[in-house]
Structure formats: structure tokens, C-alpha cells
């Protein structure tokens, strides 16, 4: 009988510990959904989604070209075909929340095409996106991307 209670206690402790470890901020799923929507919209060149739903009018960007820019500059790049990719993969490694701010970090692999720098090559980069929850919606207020490898 003592063995039964010992096993029951261990089993309950493992269940509780697993539940605590697997507990996730409910906002994380929404940020992951929006990150994927942003990635897909860039890949498709869907300016309506990017301009109206994802990118804040106040967004600033530290670009892979090592230039600090604004949302207007990013919009101009999109319109001119300078954000034109054959493929765009994003691997989120960490999402952290601080009140109404979400910080997303990870890696991206893109394959630029057309007249872009590195067209036809595989470009690996590190990224950080900063999201702000305001007026009942999330938008990107800052982005940083750094090229780490071109093949």
C-alpha cells in the first residue's frame, strides 16, 4: 500500500510540474499567428495586410543593409520590388512579454529574387520584431534584421 501512495504522489507531482512547464501565455499564440501572417504577406507582396494590419505607422527598422529606416521606407521597398522573395522561412526562438509589448527573436532564411542584392542566393539572418498592443490590436513598432550568411 505504501508503494501505491508513493507512486500516486510521484505521478501527481509529475502531472502538476508538466502543467506548469507547459503553461503558455495566451498572447503567444496570437503573436505567432501574426508573425506568420506578416511573413506570408511579405512573401506575397500583400501591402494591404502589411500597411493596414501589421506594420505600425510609427515602425522603425534596422535593415539587413545596416540602415535605420521608417515604415515609409519599408513600404517604398515593398512597392518597388525590393522585398521580393522566392521563399521566406522564419524560426521563432523566443517570445517575451512586458505589459503590452511583445519581443520576438529568432532566425530567418530568405531567397531574394529580381533586382535585389543577393538575388538567387540563400540568405540567413537573425531578427527581432517588437510588437505593441494598442487599441485592441497588435502591430510591429520596431524590427531589426542582420544578415549572418549568404550562400
Give a label for each model feature:
Residues 111-115, 148-150:
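Sequence/structural signature of outer-membrane beta-barrel proteins
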Residues 1-27:
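Bacterial Sec-dependent N-terminal signal peptides
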Residues 26-32, 46-98, 107, 119-122:
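A solvent-exposed, acidic/Ser-Thr-rich amphipathic alpha-helical stretch
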Amino acid at each position: 500500500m505504501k508503494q501505491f501512495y508513493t507512486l500516486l504522489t510521484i505521478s501527481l507531482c509529475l502531472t502538476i510540474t508538466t502543467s506548469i512547464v507547459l503553461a503558455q501565455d495566451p498572447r503567444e499564440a496570437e503573436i505567432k499567428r501574426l508573425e506568420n501572417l506578416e511573413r506570408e504577406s511579405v512573401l506575397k507582396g500583400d501591402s494591404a495586410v502589411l500597411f493596414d494590419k501589421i506594420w505600425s505607422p510609427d515602425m522603425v527598422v534596422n535593415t539587413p543593409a545596416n540602415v535605420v529606416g521608417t515604415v515609409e521606407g519599408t513600404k517604398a521597398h515593398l512597392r518597388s520590388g525590393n522585398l521580393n522573395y522566392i521563399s521566406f522561412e522564419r524560426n521563432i526562438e523566443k517570445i517575451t512579454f512586458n505589459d503590452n509589448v511583445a519581443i520576438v527573436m529568432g532566425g530567418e532564411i530568405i531567397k531574394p529574387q529580381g533586382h535585389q542584392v543577393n538575388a538567387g542566393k540563400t540568405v540567413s539572418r537573425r531578427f527581432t520584431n517588437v510588437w505593441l498592443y494598442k487599441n485592441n490590436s497588435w502591430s510591429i513598432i520596431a524590427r531589426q534584421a542582420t544578415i549572418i550568411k549568404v550562400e
